[in-house]
Amino acid sequence: MAGHSQFKNIMHRKGRQDAVRSKMFSKLAREITVAAKSGTPDPSMNPRLRLAIQNAKAVSMPKDNIQRAINKASMGDAENYEAVRYEGYGPGGVAVIVEALTDNRNRSASNVRAAFTKAGGAMGETGSVSFMWDRVGEIYYPASAGSADKVMEAAIEAGADDVESDEEGHTIYCAFENLGEVSKALEAALGEAESVKLIWRPQNNVPVDEERAQSLMKLVATLEDDDDVQSVYANFEVDDETLAKLSAA
C-alpha cells in the first residue's frame, strides 16, 4: 500500500507546478515572524526560528523576504498570531488535523469548518482525532543525500526512530523532543536537510479508493489554500495502482 506521505508528494509536485509561490512565502514568513517574536531574533539562540529559516531557504525564499519577516517581529510590527489546531473527519471517515497561525480565530474556524462541510466531512472538537496520531519530528532529505543504507546508518547514529526511503528521498522520524539534537547530528553526516519540522504521524491509515482519494486531495488543497493554515494531515492510504493514476492525472 502507498502511504499518505507518498500521496502528499504527488500534491507537492503538482503544487510546485501550479501554486502561487507568493502564498507559500507568505505562510513561511508568518512562521518566521511568530518564531522570532516568541524568542530572540537570533536564529543561533532560537531553535524554532532556525528551523523556520532553514525550511524557507529549502524552497528558495529570498533572503530579503526572510530578513523582513524577522524584522517585523523585532520592531514590534507583528500581528498577534496564535497557533490553533482543528480536527475533524473527511470523506470516508478519514481523520484530518489542520494547524494554523491566525490573528482571528473566528475567521479561521469558519473557513476550516466550511471546507470540511463542502467535502462531505465534519469538523469536530479539539482532541476528537489527534489521539490517533503521534507528535514526532520529521527530517527530509532528497535522494541525492545518499543511498537508503547510508541514510539509515546516519539516522541510527543520530538517534532517530524510523526512516522511510523511496525514489524521491528519505524521510526520517524521531521523538519530538529530540528533533533539534537529531537534525544537528544528521546535518553533520548528510548536510543540511530540505526540511525539519514537527508533524502529526498517524498510528494507522484508512485505505481509500480512487474516487475518495480525489475528494480528499481536493479537501486538503482547499485547506492548504487558506492563508491561516500552515499544515494539513490526513490518515489515509491508497494502493499502488491508484497512486499511479493520481500521479499521471
Swiss-Prot record:
GO terms of biological process kind: regulation of DNA-templated transcription
Entry GO terms, CC: cytosol
InterPro entries (alphabetical): Integrase-like_N (IPR017856), TACO1_YebC-like_2nd/3rd_dom (IPR048300), TACO1_YebC_N (IPR049083), Transcrip_reg_TACO1-like (IPR002876), Transcrip_reg_TACO1-like_dom3 (IPR026564), YebC-like (IPR029072)
UniProt-listed SUPFAM superfamilies: YebC-like
Pfam families: TACO1_YebC_N, Transcrip_reg
Gene3D superfamilies membership: 1.10.10.200, 3.30.70.980
Domain of life: Bacteria
Compartments, record wording: Cytoplasm
GO MF assignments: DNA binding
Keyword list, A-Z: Cytoplasm, DNA-binding, Transcription, Transcription regulation
Family: Belongs to the TACO1 family.
Name recorded for this polypeptide: Probable transcriptional regulatory protein mll3945
Organism: Mesorhizobium japonicum (strain LMG 29417 / CECT 9101 / MAFF 303099) (Mesorhizobium loti (strain MAFF 303099))
Lineage, broadest ranks: Bacteria, Pseudomonadati, Pseudomonadota, Alphaproteobacteria, Hyphomicrobiales
